[in-house]
Amino acid sequence: MANRIKKGDQVVINTGKDKGKQGEVLRVDGDRVIVSNANLIKRHTKPNPQAGVAGGVVEREASIHISNVNIVNPATGKGERVGFKVLEDGRKLRVFRSSGEALDA
């Protein structure tokens, strides 16, 4: 089944500590997404002079389940559900369920 959310989409987070935050999808990995500046975690890294990595505490984004985000509708500015519409030539088109507007051109 095709994903309703793709890399580069603007999304809003529905649940959790970052509820209400908006960001861009950086990566989709199965049923999980990584959203820019959301669900930040700290990782302790060892210094590695060969790779040019300085040690210390590094803050980065962790993944969020795809069911906990909605795509932002540019017309309303709110997160809305997305469905699919099959065209006559067999292509699938992502559409907002509330208005039926096409998400992809």
From Swiss-Prot:
Keyword terms of this UniProt record: Ribonucleoprotein, Ribosomal protein, RNA-binding, rRNA-binding
Gene3D superfamilies (alphabetical): 2.30.30.30
UniProt cross-references to Pfam families, sorted A to Z: KOW (PF00467), ribosomal_L24 (PF17136)
GO molecular function, one term: structural constituent of ribosome
Example of a GO cellular component annotation carried by this entry: ribosome
Assembly and oligomerization: Part of the 50S ribosomal subunit.
Record's function text: One of two assembly initiator proteins, it binds directly to the 5'-end of the 23S rRNA, where it nucleates assembly of the 50S subunit. One of the proteins that surrounds the polypeptide exit tunnel on the outside of the subunit.
The protein's name in its UniProt record: Large ribosomal subunit protein uL24
